[in-house]
Amino acid sequence: MHRVEQPYPVPAVTITLFCLLLTAMAVSAVILLSVDDAVYLKQLIEDGGPVQLVGQTAIFAAFAVACVFALVDSKRTSDYLHLSYLLMFYALREADYHYKVSEHAKATQFKRFFSHELIPLYTKLFLATIVILFLVVMYRYLKKQKPVFIAALKARLPWALMALAWGGVFFLSQLVDQVPMFHDVTGQVFEEIFESSAEVLVLTAMILFRLQIRHSRASDPGRVDYSGASIS
C-alpha cells in the first residue's frame, strides 16, 4: 500500500514563506508607488533596477541549481536537463535577451518579433528554432511531470504549493502586461513585482523539492516517490 508522503518542511514553515513573500510584494509596491520622481521610478523597475535584479538573480540561480542536479542526481538527470533548458529560456526571456539579436527588437514586443518587417529572416529563424525546441521540451516535461505534480498537490507538499503559486503570480504578471487598462505607471510597477516574485517562487520551489527528497530519504530509504524513482 502506498504510504502518503509527509510534507517537509511542516505546513507552518510553508505558510511563513508565503507570508514573507506577500509582505515583500506589498512593501515593494508601497515604496515604489510612493516615489514621485517618474525618472527615478523607471530606474527602479526597469532593466538594471533592483526589482528586476532580484528576479533575474533568482531565476538564473534556479537554472544553475537545475544544471548541478542534472549532474549529481542520476535518477532525475533527464528531468533536470529538461528543466534546465526551460529555465534557461525563462531567464533569457525575462532578461529581454531577444532585444540583443536585432537592433529593431527593442522597439517591438516578443509576440510581434516574428512579424517585424525590419528584423532579418535569419534572425527570426534562429530564434524560432530556440522557441520550437522550448515547446517540444516543455511538452515532454509537462507530460511526464503532470501526475507527479498532481499527486504532490494532493499531499500538499510545499514545493508543489510553491509551484502552483508561481503559476498564479506568473499569470497575473502576464495579465497586467497584456490588458491595456493596466498600461500605466502603476500597472508597470505591479507587473515587475509580479514577474520578480514569480522568479523567486521558482527558486523556492526547487529548494523545497530537494528538502522534501532529503527528508523522504531519511525517513524511508526504500520508498518510491511519485515519479517512480527510488528516493534513496
Annotate each language-model stretch with its function.
Residues 81-93, 161-166:
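Hydrophobic alpha-helical membrane-insertion segments
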Residues 102-106, 176-191:
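Interfacial helix-loop-helix junctions of multi-pass membrane proteins
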Residues 45-54, 110-126, 188-196:
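Short aromatic-rich membrane-water interface segments that cap or initiate transmembrane helices
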Residues 12-32, 163-168:
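Alpha-helical transmembrane segments
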Residues 24-25, 55-68, 123-140, 195-213:
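Hydrophobic cores of alpha-helical transmembrane segments in multi-pass inner/ER membrane proteins
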Residues 95-151:
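Membrane-proximal helix-loop-helix units in multi-pass membrane proteins
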Residues 32-42, 174-184:
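Juxtamembrane "helix-exit" motif on the non-cytosolic side of transmembrane helices
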Residues 142-167:
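Membrane-helix boundary/juxtamembrane motif in polytopic membrane proteins
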